[in-house]
Regions:
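Domain-level marker for long, solvent-exposed, non-transmembrane regions
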Residues: 16-311
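Sec-dependent bacterial lipoprotein signal peptides
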Residues: 1-14
Length: 311
């Protein structure tokens, strides 16, 4: 029996003696992952190892929360991180130094949570400005004010999730009604489109595509629920122009009017033109109108957005 006890003790000492306490995994295992976020680094000197560990922590935060990168809140979170352990593994051949950068999750939460609460309160306050019954243009103006806060709230939540051991979101039920509010209010603004003249289908394609990219609802010009009206008249000049340098040249233009259908007011007018030369007359007409369509679509997007923001 004594021999058996002696053998067990001997095996225990051998096991303990074989445990390398200088490994990164062993040193990191001393920290409760529920309470701390720990990142390792190494270098030829203590300072190099410390700097590398802290830099690695900073890079991980920035990589997982790109929208918060470069902001004050990220700097404030990092201000709570410390390099708590620096050591040298004498048994390793490279004799490098190792370091651990440690971020207490509770301290990080103390920075992020108040900002989340404040942003939620601001969003709630703005949401109370929505009209009853709904007024598409007035509601969209409120949504424009909310959108920067929505983006800020989402960035803060990314940071909050990264700090949590379980990667949970902060009060998702509170933020859920606002996440897509801008898209919803934008889609509620119905735009009627009417194009008359040569190559009208070509023009319509560019205009509708631009409005869809903005997220606006597109309807027929005769729809009684339209909020904004886009009216375009296209023309083709020099349709019978002579060949120049072996090409048949054509010049196209469009007169565009943007109207507030609710107020029956034209808030923007402009003209665009373009020219193209090909070996075939029909191709010249089409390509010149495509150029007009691209220009018109770009200006419609810019002018309409400015009006919707300031109306």
């Amino acid at each position: 029996m004594k021999k058996l006890i002696t053998l067990c003790c001997t095996l225990g000492l051998v096991a303990c003696g074989g445990l390398n306490k200088n490994t990164i995994s062993y040193q990191m295992s001393k920290y409760d992952t529920q309470a701390y976020y720990v990142v390792a680094g190494d270098g030829a000197t203590k300072k190099a190892a410390s700097d590398q560990a802290f830099s690695a922590l900073q890079k991980e935060l920035q990589a997982h929360t790109p929208e918060a990168a470069g902001t004050q809140v990220l700097d404030d979170v990092l201000a709570n991180a410390k390099v708590e352990k620096v050591w040298r593994d004498k048994e390793a051949q490279d004799k490098h130094y190792y370091a651990l950068a440690v971020l207490p999750r509770e301290k990080a939460n103390a920075v992020v949570v108040p900002l989340l609460n404040r942003t939620d309160a601001q969003l709630t306050g703005l949401a109370q400005q929505f009209s009853t019954p709904a007024d598409p243009l007035a509601d969209l103006k409120v949504a424009y004010k909310m959108q920067p806060l929505v983006e800020h709230r989402a960035a803060l939540d990314d940071l909050y999730q990264f700090v949590q051991a379980d990667r949970s979101s902060y009060m998702p039920e509170t933020f859920a009604p606002y996440k897509n509010i801008f898209k919803e209010k934008m889609a509620a603004v119905l735009v009627g489109v009417e194009v008359n003249g040569v190559e009208s289908e070509t023009m319509v394609t560019y205009v509708i595509d631009a409005l869809n990219k903005m997220g606006l609802g597109v309807v027929d010009a005769s729809d009684p629920d339209k909020v904004v009206s886009v009216q375009i008249d296209t023309e083709v000049d020099n349709y019978s122009s002579k060949k120049v340098d072996g090409l048949i040249w054509c010049s196209s233009s469009a007169a565009v009017s943007l109207m507030d259908a609710q107020r029956d007011v034209t808030f923007s007018r402009f003209n665009v033109q373009d020219r193209a030369g090909t070996t075939r007359l029909n191709d010249s007409v089409r390509r010149s109108m495509q150029g007009v369509g691209r220009q018109a679509a770009a200006q419609i997007s810019t002018r309409l957005e400015n009006y919707l923001k300031t109306k």
